């Protein structure tokens, strides 16, 4: 005699429909997790790139401000003023602070770096105490020893300061002056300052951009006898 037992319903397993529903749910969960991961990764990458751009621009700005601040320094300035003259070779025509270039994107200046009181001839073998910064082809450039002391110097004759990973889109120098009397006859002092505005972007992502501004007070006032 055959005995037929009813199969336990709990041992039947999942139906095809139930498996498909479970699979869809798993796919949706994994897709959500993947989307969150990608969003976090993009945010992290953007933060790193923004920080990189900021560091590059800050370094470039600090280099310019610390250098421009010294413009016109002359070791013998006290002696010149005591004789009511201004024979400062670092404030003469052609060596004094000068802003030029396209849209005032270039600055030239000199200072007595070695404090020997004289401005040397242009030389490629030693610091000739002539300095400059400008925007050229998306990069900040500085004038090296022996190069043309001109805002229109060939691009290859000056050196790039900024890294190729960033592109400068704007650089402007604005000179501001104020003349005050000294109370000694007709002599006066001219105070000078330079306002710098610089904008840059990531070369690989032009949507990431930043603008820095700085006010630089030139420490060496110009004596007008």
Name the predicted role of every residue range:
Residues 67, 71, 143, 219:
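Phosphate/oxyanion-binding loops and surfaces in catalytic or ligand/nucleic-acid-binding neighborhoods
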Residues 3-5, 150-225:
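Short linear sequence signals and composition-biased patches located at protein termini or domain-edge surfaces
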Residues 39, 46-49, 58, 78-79, ...:
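Short capping/connector residues at structural and topological boundaries
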Residues 2, 12-75:
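Aliphatic-rich helix starts adjacent to a transmembrane/signal segment
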Residues 45, 68-109:
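Short, glycine/small-hydrophobic-rich surface segments
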Residues 89-181:
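Type IV pilin-like appendage domain
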């Amino acid at each position: 005699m055959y005995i037929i037992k009813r199969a336990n319903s709990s041992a039947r397993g999942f139906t095809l429909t139930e498996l498909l529903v479970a699979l869809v749910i798993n796919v949706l969960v994994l897709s959500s997790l993947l989307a969150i991961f990608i969003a976090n990764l993009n945010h992290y990458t953007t933060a790193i790139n923004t920080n990189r751009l900021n560091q590059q621009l800050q370094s470039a700005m600090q280099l310019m401000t610390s250098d421009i601040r010294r413009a016109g320094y002359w070791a013998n300035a006290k002696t010149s003023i005591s004789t009511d003259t201004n024979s400062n070779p670092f404030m003469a025509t052609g060596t004094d602070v000068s802003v030029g270039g396209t849209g005032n994107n270039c600055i030239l200046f000199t200072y007595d770096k070695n404090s020997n009181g004289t401005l040397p001839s242009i030389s490629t073998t030693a610091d000739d105490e002539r300095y400059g910064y400008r925007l050229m082809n998306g990069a900040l450039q500085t004038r090296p020893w022996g190069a043309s002391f001109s805002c229109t110097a060939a691009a290859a004759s000056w050196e790039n300061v900024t890294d190729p990973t960033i592109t400068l889109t704007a650089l402007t120098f604005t000179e501001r002056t104020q003349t005050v009397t000294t109370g000694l006859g007709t002599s006066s002092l001219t105070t000078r300052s330079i306002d710098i505005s610089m904008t840059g972007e990531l070369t690989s992502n032009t949507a990431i951009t930043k603008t820095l501004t700085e006010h630089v007070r030139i420490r060496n006032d110009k004596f007008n006898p």
